[in-house]
Amino acid sequence: MGEFYTKGEPREATVATCILNTGNWVLPSDYADEVAYKPPFMHWFIAIFSLPVGHITETTARLPSALSLIGITMMFFYLLYKRTNSYRAFVASIILLTSFEMHRSGLEARVDMTLAFFMIGALISLFKWEEKELKGFPLLIPVFLGGAALVKGPIGILLPCMVFGIYLLILKRYSLWKIIYKNVFIALPALAILLVWYILAYKQGGEHFLNLVYAENFGRFLGMDSKKLGISYELGHEGPFWYYIPAIILGFMPWSLLLIFAAFSISIKKSTQKLSIWQRFINLDKLTLFSIISVVIIITFYAIPSSKRSVYIMPAYPGAAYLLTLLYEWALNKKTILIKLLARIILVISGILVLLIACFHFVDLYSVSTLLLHDTKTLHDISLFSTAFQHPSIFGFLVWFLLLCVFISVWYVLRKETARIVLISTLVLFICTQIFLEGLAYPVFKNGYSSRPFAEKIMSKYDLKNNTYVMNNLKEYSNLYGLNFYMDNNYKNFEKEQPKNGYFITGLSYIDKIKALYNNKYIFKELERTSDRFNDYGDVIVLYRFNQTGKEIKR
């Protein structure tokens, strides 16, 4: 799957590194003195999976997300298989599994997929509980809710209960008080689980921990200013209210292309039905109704705060996948041309990949590109693939050959078979395309932007253990999360400790500012630097040795 090439993955993996190195399972740190403000449930899994090898690896760090995606797919398939038919269950599950957002997140060391697993597990269990008329104590629901809360906080409890409560209200089979009572009934055990961690974490982190909890759970939702919250980082990426509409369409690529095709091919006719839209809505079968409600409520809830990321709405993806599958069934019966159009698009994409790899193998595209292109990043990327594909491994060749064989098979099926078989063949082709990308293409790209080579180089030449310092103020400087992970979470906060001597690492773009700030107190001598800025940090990384001059800082 490749090395870490972004800031997010090594940041999460480093929390687990701290757990193994220090034995602190309650409130570990992830960068110098930076406290991991999220509950560390996912990081516990990473640490446990890493115990046999004794340290955190890229694979063990990504394992919770991969297992969560598999678990979500299995729960979703079983839910549909028992209530619809095997064909619909299979198509919906593959659409969910291979959709761009779910597939991507399932292979990353981030908390979002683990959170989605517990929230989706809770939603499915809540749906099944209503089918039993809310009888008995559903043990799995508090477990799923508690797991979601231990991954990201109270939102893991609040949102599934909100979806379920609105679903029960629309069913009109239960009184308002019973709906409230039943939601409280299942939420309290989960809250108790979360409260235990909060108490233990407060004993370690004190008031600073409470400030972080308030900022993350209330400040982020209300769009409060980070300065007023007393935190040294910004609360996420801002986006407009409608952000999640294109986000979920892009997140379901390529399968959401059918939705776009259908939007231009359906003719709007005046309805002859006497029932209103609302009456038709509440008369839908339970599975369709619950799917619509979960998608609408989850997207609307996350649309309210200014901080937005496409992965936040992944708990809505099973419901959306089911609704999208119904659209595919409509196309199979009414608009088979749309299915074949989608198949041709995916066939072309796969064919381009097959041809491109062959070109890279037989032609030095990097040499050709240098004559036509001048963008250094583009040339760097072409160089990575050109070098790798000119000398592919046996595994790489087998993955390429698999894609070629399936490509030829689908090309034949598209000419001869029915739309149903074409759809299944297209699903298989896209799975093989993803296997090709994950097994051959992505690792080349990821490794080309990893900080690991530089970390290994400087650690072999210098004694950096417990003697390496960085700036840790996200409002002023970017953090070197990738390098920190590959150096075994060994950094200390330079500004707070102000040591007499040691090693200092920063980006080339920051060093003049830092030297000016500490001009009269420290002397910095450059030792090593990366050859370019093509790494997860996005800048030339420089290692310095510093010594204190004994003078005061000029501010």
Where do the language-model regions lie?
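Membrane-integral, polyisoprenol-dependent glycosyltransferases
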Residues: 1-341, 360-365, 393, 532-540
